[in-house]
Amino acid sequence: MSTTWFVGADWLAEHIDDPEIQIIDARMASPGQEDRNVAQEYLNGHIPGAVFFDIEALSDHTSPLPHMLPRPETFAVAMRELGVNQDKHLIVYDEGNLFSAPRAWWMLRTFGVEKVSILGGELAGWQRDDLLLEEGAVELPEGEFNAAFNPEAVVKVTDVLLASHENTAQIIDARPATRFNAEVDEPRPGLRRGHIPGALNVPWTELVREGELKTTDELDAIFFGRGVSYDKPIIVSCGSGVTAAVVLLALATLDVPNVKLYDGAWSEWGARADLPVEPEK
C-alpha cells in the first residue's frame, strides 16, 4: 500500500492546503442516537475543507437492511457531486472514537480508491491540539470518480451460512460481548439475540484507544486470545456492517490476507428465523 493507514493531526495541519489531499468527515450516529443530527453537527464545525460523507445516505436504499453498499454507479455519482477525486489522497475522520471512519475507508477502498488514510485521533484529537475548525458546507467543483467495485471485499448471507456450516472461514463478530452472548436485546427492533454459529467475538471497542488502533502487539494478543488464526480466511460482521470495518482495518494493518466483510451483518441474520443462532434457546 502506497499510503499510511493513519496520518497525524500535525501532518494534516501541515498539508491541509496540498491540492493532492482531500478531507472527508464520516461522523455517524450509532444505534440509540436517533436524536442526533449528524449533518448539523458537521455544519457546526468540521476540519477545514472537509466534505460530509454521509454513510446513511450512501447506503443502498433499495434494500431493507440499513447499510448495504450502494451500486457502484450510485456511489460514483455521489462522490463526484461531493467533489471527491479518486486519484487524490483521501483523509477520513469521524468524531473521535474510530466508530465510522473505518467504514468510510473500507467503502472508498472497495470502490477503487487506492490512497485512503484515517486521521489518527480523529476530530477529538484535532480539537485537543487546538487546531481550527470551519463552519458551514464545503462546496467543491465536481470530482472525477469512476467506481471500480471489488467484489472480493464483501460476502453475502449464503457465503456466511456456508462458512458457518462447513467451517471454511472464521467469522469474527465485532458487537459487544453482551449482544454476542444473547444477554441483552439488540438496539434495532425485530432482531433475535445471539450470534452466527461458530463465530468468534472480538468487540471493536477493544481494538481502539483514543481514536486510533492499539499497537500491533496488543492487536495480535487480542485476536490470538479470541482464537483467531491469520492463516485461514476471515469474514467480519457486526450489527449493520459499520464496526465490522474496524476489525477489518485492524487486520489489514497486521497484513492479514483474505478478509471480507458481511454487509448484511446481524441486521440480516438476526431478522431471519430460517437461519441458525447460538446460543440456542
Stretch-by-stretch model annotation:
Residues M1-K281:
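Cytosolic catalytic domains that perform sulfur/thiol-centered chemistry
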